[in-house]
Amino acid sequence: MEDEEVAESWEEAADSGEIDRRLEKKLKITQKESRKSKSPPKVPIVIQDDSLPAGPPPQIRILKRPTSNGVVSSPNSTSRPTLPVKSLAQREAEYAEARKRILGSASPEEEREKPILDRPTRISQPEDSRQPNNVIRQPLGPDGSQGFKQRR
């Protein structure tokens, strides 16, 4: 770089051809470096043509999941254990026990006998004591007209 001449302006360097020589020199250097550090050859990409027959479609197999003990179960068998069938008397006894635990009574008949005290009784007034429903005024329209009484 020390022995290179520096031009007064870029116009003088362009006229003398100095810029062209420097560019060619740098281009040769970069080409040499690229040859030294050659990358492995690029693999060509094959684009399949639609006119050629395609291969068979890939095989899809549906596999069954093994159960917890490693044996594949059949689709008809259920994974739930079968519960023993209870008789009507056993079911009624369990129902009565649960009802007593939750509601405090064993059967619904016990509650029907007791009157319901939670609801307030409605007091009905005799017809005479009711106040008459008198209309105090008839509404007027916004412009002072008769309002609802106005006939169309």
Curated annotation (Swiss-Prot):
Pfam families: SUZ, SUZ-C. Residues 29-152 are annotated as: Disordered. Residues 66-81 have a biased composition (Polar residues). This is SUZ RNA-binding domain-containing. Residues 42-107 form the SUZ domain. The modification Phosphoserine is found at S37, S39, S51, S105, S107. Belongs to the SZRD1 family. The gene is SZRD1. Residues 111-152 form the SUZ-C domain. Keywords: Acetylation, Phosphoprotein. Residues 89-100, 109-130 have a biased composition (Basic and acidic residues). The modification N-acetylmethionine is found at M1.
